[in-house]
Swiss-Prot record:
PANTHER family: HYPOTHETICAL OXIDOREDUCTASE (EUROFUNG), TRANS-ENOYL REDUCTASE STHE. The gene is gkaC. Belongs to the zinc-containing alcohol dehydrogenase family. It comes from the Eukaryota. Its EC number is 1.-.-.-. This is Trans-enoyl reductase gkaC. It holds the Pfam family ADH_zinc_N. Residues 15-357 form the Enoyl reductase (ER) domain. Trans-enoyl reductasee; part of the gene cluster that mediates the biosynthesis of GKK1032, fungal natural products containing a macrocyclic para-cyclophane connected to a decahydrofluorene ring system that show potent antitumor activities. Within the pathway, the PKS-NRPS gkaA, with the help of the trans-enoyl reductase gkaC, synthesize the polyketide-tyrosyl acyl thioester product which can be reductively off-loaded by the terminal reductase (R) domain in gkaA. Monomer.
Length: 361
């Protein structure tokens, strides 16, 4: 700790809604007993990094979720119980955009993390690849699959029934390819949607069949392909059009739908009652109360954080075994200053089939 700089920089939300700026002179945090202090080596961008600040602005809060870096200090409990040590390479996700904890966010030089929320990076992964896995979207995927959709199969205990389908809408996204891999390991057949140019990409991660989301009959085509038996739909995109496509794809017996965004309840109210709809808010996995407006408020839920910590351990094993691999990455130079440019590119939908990663060291 003695050799650390006296201050650091961070990408924070500015006063202009949906905009960002570099904040300088920020203090280096000190870990509590259960925390580790990490020097950030690389960060990766998620759509939530620009969407949440636009929807629930919290000026001055640090932005960013996915990171990789090196442990440079541990709290007393973390040192005794986590299995980590100084110098370990770790990755994970910060649950940013929190009014009550404005310092939490990955787009900075040094971060605090709960020791049970980080995973050990194997030598087979680069800093950039580890950041691309992170855990922000990937943990939301886990929450969607096993909490909202309530799937019976897991990678550790896959289903044995043949021909059980799950739809991943938006399969060429980083969350999509991670979901496809988890579902295949859990024994499911995966159908997905993306642009035709990305059909090969999603198939390389395990999708059985890809459908063009531009097609007005996309949902009906999926329903036909799955023999009117589809029960589960995971919607990474979660817009009015994608919701309609997912509902159209689910078979006559109904099923479950899970979105990655706050659902438009007026639209859901007009849809089939035989489909149970939910959405996942990744901030819940902190286990803390999240004081945000507009449907994003979360009650404290320590049990969910315990579940999340166990999920991270399972991911860590699968990653070390090479059973889960990162999304294709696009490495961009320029550090934190260029992260702001990258967020603009994502907002303008200029990125497809790649995970934007920025080395900081």
């Amino acid at each position: 700790m003695d050799s650390l700089p006296t201050s650091q920089r961070a990408v924070v939300q500015s006063e202009d809604v949906g905009s960002f700026e570099i904040s300088r002179g920020r203090p280096i945090p000190v870990p509590s007993s259960s925390q580790i202090l990490i020097k950030v080596f690389a960060v990766a961008l998620n759509h939530c990094d620009w969407k949440m600040p636009a929807r629930v602005p919290c000026p001055g809060t640090v932005d960013g979720a996915d990171y990789s870096g090196t442990i440079i200090a541990l709290g007393d409990t973390a040192a005794l119980t986590s299995g980590f040590k100084i110098g370990d390479r770790v990755a994970g996700a910060q649950m940013a955009s929190q009014r009550r904890r404005p310092w939490v966010g990955a787009f900075t030089e040094y971060i605090l993390e709960e020791a049970d929320s980080a995973w050990l990076v194997p030598d087979s992964l680069s800093w950039e690849e580890a950041a691309a896995i992170g855990c922000a979207a990937t943990s939301s995927v886990g929450m969607a699959l096993w909490k909202s959709l309530n799937l019976p199969g897991t990678p550790q205990n896959p289903i044995t029934e043949d021909g059980k389908y799950v739809l991943v809408y938006g399969g060429s996204s980083a969350s999509g390819t991670f979901a496809i891999q988890l579902l295949r390991l859990s024994g499911y057949n995966v159908v997905t949607t993306c642009s035709p140019k990305n059909f090969g990409l999603v198939e390389s991660y395990g999708a059985e069949k890809a459908f063009d989301y531009h097609s007005p009959t996309c949902g009906e085509d999926i329903r036909t392909y799955t023999g009117n038996t589809l029960e589960y739909a995971l919607d990474i995109i979660t817009e009015a059009k994608t919701i309609r496509h997912c509902y159209a794809a689910i078979g006559r017996g109904g099923g479950r739908y899970c979105g990655f965004e706050l659902l438009p309840h007026d639209l859901i109210a007009t849809m089939r009652r035989s489909v149970k709809a939910e959405w996942v808010n990744g901030l819940e996995m902190t286990g803390l109360e999240i004081d945000l407006p507009g449907g994003y408020y979360c009650k404290a839920n320590p049990e969910l954080h315990i579940w999340f910590a166990d999920l991270i351990k399972q991911y860590s094993v699968l990653i070390s075994q090479g059973k889960l691999r990162p999304h294709p990455i696009q490495i961009n130079k320029g550090g934190l200053e260029k992260v702001i440019d990258g967020l603009g590119q994502m907002k303008r939908r200029e990125i497809s089939g790649k995970k934007m990663v920025y080395p900081l060291v």
